[in-house]
Structures are given as structure tokens and as C-alpha cells.
Design a protein with these regions (language model features):
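Small-residue-centered hinge/linker elements
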Residues: 1-158, 162, 188-297, 301-308
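Short acidic-hydrophobic, aromatic-tinged amphipathic segments that line or gate anion-handling sites
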Residues: 68-69, 174-180
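PDZ peptide-recognition modules
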Residues: 158, 165-168, 177, 183-184
Length: 308
């Protein structure tokens, strides 16, 4: 990854996180955060700055050695919640009757169309999921910020978001209030660069051209990484380029199976599910691939239903 290459490159002194927006789920945020945590073992600095930290961005940024906030900025810290909507009464008013086929007590995807409230089973699984996720978030932030989980939960109970920025410093969530215009000088000081000297900064795209500090493998052997992202369709009946086209995935997996240079396959799955038929066909193709070489599955933000 870019973070790992930055860790190994002696010319790179640290990482600056400009916390503006990041469309990622908790699993992806956790992976990036762990990579940053590993980067810090090199002794290099990590600094985060934000005008408005969402809860997810703060979770990621809290791993930094220093967390900076604009004096007029804000930080969201208020826990997790699920707010499903139910459309049964609306559908009845417009004369629509849903025909539902489902298997399993906890298969709750259709509940908004056939119920007016959450079932006991769905409430149970959502509570377990949210409690587990929040527990991981608070434990990680508590460790990085040298705070207790109890203190973090107390702040969340206050629904912290629109409080003055000074509150975030007072309660230990933020280290320093600083205007964005002064951040560059702050970073120069950490990197040991004179205030009047130029400080080159590499973006993530620039890191693509930075070579890894590892010997080049000349054996010709390959570990393939195959990405399966999006909803799963049934194959030929679907014409969209988005999501997981089951027929294409099956062909690709067959090619990987037949390629003698590919010694193993990492299947990266980020999917909420979709077509039961398409999922079954992909499952069979993966099993055929397993007979020839090792297959490791890496699950992303979603690996639900057919994705699982």
C-alpha cells in the first residue's frame, strides 16, 4: 500500500491527513487506521487536520500523533444508531401488495415493505452489530488518545457536534486549534524544515510512482488479487457495467485457475449480495479454483447474503 511504501522510504518524514471527506465503511477505515498505526512504528510522525470531523473521519484521524482542529471547526462524536424506514402503510394506501419470499428468521431486508416496526430478531442483530462496532471504535480511540472508554461514552452521550472547538481540546479529543493556513508551518517544524524553505508534499496518486523497498521477484510466480465489488447479478440478463457480473467473474476465475504462473488467489469481496442464482454460480467457480490453488477471501465493508 501507499502507507507501507511511505514507511519504508527514508525520504518521507511523516504523513499528513487532511480530514475532509472519505466515502468508506468502518471495515475500510479500520484497515487504513491499522496501516497508519503500523507506519508510526517507523518513528515517523502522523498529523491530522480537519475543519469538520465526521465520526468516521475522527476515528481514522485519532491514530495520529497530533489531531488538529480549526478554531471555528467542529467534531462529531455521538455514537451509532440505525433508523430504518417502513413503507407498509404507504403501500397499502396506494394499493400495492408485496409478494415476499424469504428464508431465515434474521433475513430482514424485506421488513420495511411488510411491517410497521422492526422484528425482535432484527432488533437483536442490529443491536449486536452496533454495540460491537462502537466497542471497537471506542477501544481504538481510547488507546490512541490516552482516554478511557467511559470518558468517550460520556462525551457521546452529550451528542457532541455543535459545541465550541475549545470543548474538543478540553475533553482530550483534539490536541491543538489551528487555522489551515498555518498547518504547513506546523508540519515544517515537525519535519525539521526551516520555515522559509520549500516542503515537498506527495499525494496518494504520487505514491503510485514510488517504488517499493523490496527485491524484485524474478520467478514469474504471481499471487492474484481479484476484486468483487457491488451487487451480484444473474449474468447474461444484466447489461450494467456496475456491480458483480456473475458470468464475467466465472470466466475470470477460470482464467486464474488455468494460469500456471498464478500460485494463489486473494478474493476481495465488498458486496451486499444480490442474485441468489448468480451467487451460487460464483460459489461453484470459487470451489473449482480451490481444487487447483489456495484461495484467500478478504472481506471489505460488506460481505452479506450472496456476498458472503
Amino acid at each position: 500500500s501507499s502507507i507501507k511504501k511511505a514507511k519504508e522510504n527514508e525520504d518521507i518524514k511523516g504523513i499528513y491527513i487532511q480530514a475532509t471527506s472519505l466515502g468508506a465503511g468502518f471495515a475500510s477505515l479500520e484497515e487504513i487506521r491499522n496501516a497508519l498505526k503500523d507506519f508510526k512504528e517507523s518513528g515517523k510522525f502522523v498529523v491530522a487536520y480537519g475543519d469538520a470531523y465526521t465520526q468516521g473521519l475522527y476515528y481514522l484521524s485519532s491514530v495520529a500523533d497530533k489531531v488538529l482542529l480549526n478554531p471555528q471547526g467542529m467534531l462529531e462524536w455521538r455514537g451509532l444508531a440505525a433508523t430504518p424506514m417502513f413503507f407498509k402503510d404507504l403501500l397499502e394506501k396506494v394499493g400495492v401488495e408485496m409478494q415476499v419470499f424469504k428464508v431465515g428468521t434474521y433475513k430482514s431486508a424485506v421488513e420495511p415493505f411488510i411491517s410497521t416496526e422492526m422484528s425482535a430478531a432484527n432488533r437483536e442483530q442490529i443491536n449486536v452489530y452496533l454495540s460491537s462496532t462502537w466497542g471497537q471504535i471506542t477501544s481504538a480511540v481510547a488507546e490512541s488518545r490516552n482516554l478511557s472508554v467511559e470518558a468517550l461514552n460520556k462525551e457521546a452521550d452529550r451528542m457532541l457536534m455543535f459545541y465550541p472547538a475549545e470543548e474538543s481540546v478540553k475533553n482530550g479529543l483534539v490536541d491543538t486549534l489551528i487555522y489551515k493556513n498555518d498547518v504547513r508551518d506546523y508540519l515544517k517544524n515537525l519535519a525539521g524544515i526551516d520555515k522559509d524553505d520549500n516542503m515537498p508534499i506527495l499525494g496518494i496518486q504520487d505514491m503510485i510512482n514510488v517504488k517499493k523497498n523490496v527485491p524484485r521477484d524474478k520467478s514469474g510466480n504471481v499471487i492474484a488479487v481479484y476484486y468483487a465489488y457491488g451487487e451480484i447479478d444473474g449474468g447474461s440478463s444484466a447489461s450494467t457495467d456496475e456491480g458483480i457480473n456473475s458470468e464475467k467473474v466465472i470466466k475470470d476465475l477460470r482464467k486464474l485457475k488455468d494460469n500456471e504462473n498464478v500460485k494463489a488467489v486473494v478474493l476481495r469481496v465488498n458486496s451486499p449480495g444480490g442474485s441468489a442464482y448468480g451467487s451460487e454460480q460464483i460459489w461453484y467457480a470459487v470451489n473449482q479454483l480451490k481444487k487447483e490453488k489456495p484461495v484467500i477471501v478478504s472481506m471489505g465493508d460488506y460481505a452479506a447474503s450472496g456476498g458472503y
